[in-house]
Design a protein with these regions (language model features):
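Phosphate/nucleotide-binding beta-alpha loop and adjacent structural elements of enzyme active sites
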Residues: 1-200
Length: 200
């Protein structure tokens, strides 16, 4: 089974030649890994990126519980969920921390998803659970957005060249994480920011 790796943003493919050109950076990242499991996962990821074979990813697969175990989240986390969708990862976070946390900051640009998230987590205090119907960016601005009311909503550049229903294009507020959280110290961040990966 092959699953070629294609970039979500920007151009260029991750090939053997690319890996050779960036050998120093890749070796630097590898040297920062603290344990053998992390190094094994990195090697598998690198093999997948170059070959397109999915097996190197599958042999390093773990369940979500192990990931949360590694993160070692406690009851005093300040969590930023950028691209919060309907609040599904907020629900996971609350399960992992036993409902204990300092604050949660959630950004979601799609209006329907944002409403679902607010409805699902209506019991959380507005002081502890701060939300904004906006996308993540490097500064506060406005961008064009394709609203699809699901996981496929994205910024316009992500869809370039594909036919788009003009009624789905909306101008949306974009916020920087710093302007949204002010002086809060974030201890855990989740990014799922379709089309604004390099800017967020």
């Amino acid at each position: 089974l092959y699953a070629p790796d294609v970039p979500v943003i920007g151009g260029g493919l991750f090939t053997k030649e690319y890996a050779e050109e960036h050998r120093a950076e890749l070796e630097r990242v590898y040297s920062m890994l603290a344990d053998e499991k992390s190094k094994q996962v990195f090697d598998g990821w690198l093999e997948y990126r170059i070959t397109g074979r999915i097996h190197p990813l599958l042999r390093n697969q773990t369940d979500k519980a192990e990931g949360y175990e590694i993160l070692d989240l406690g009851g005093n986390e300040t969590y930023a969920d950028l691209g919060a969708y309907n609040g599904d990862t907020i629900t996971e976070f609350l399960e992992v921390t036993g409902g204990q946390f300092n604050k949660i900051f959630a950004m979601e640009p799609d209006g329907k998803n944002y409403s679902k998230m607010k409805r699902i987590h209506y019991k959380l205090s507005p002081y502890d659970f701060r939300t904004v119907n906006a996308g993540a960016w490097s500064c506060d601005t406005v961008c064009e957005f394709i609203s699809k009311g699901g996981r496929n909503s994205s910024l316009i550049p992500y869809e370039k060249g594909k036919p788009v229903n003009p009624s789905r294009i909306k101008e949306i507020e974009m916020r920087s994480l710093d302007s949204f959280v002010k002086d809060e110290r974030i201890t855990y961040i989740k990014y799922d920011v379709e089309g604004s990966e390099s800017e967020a």
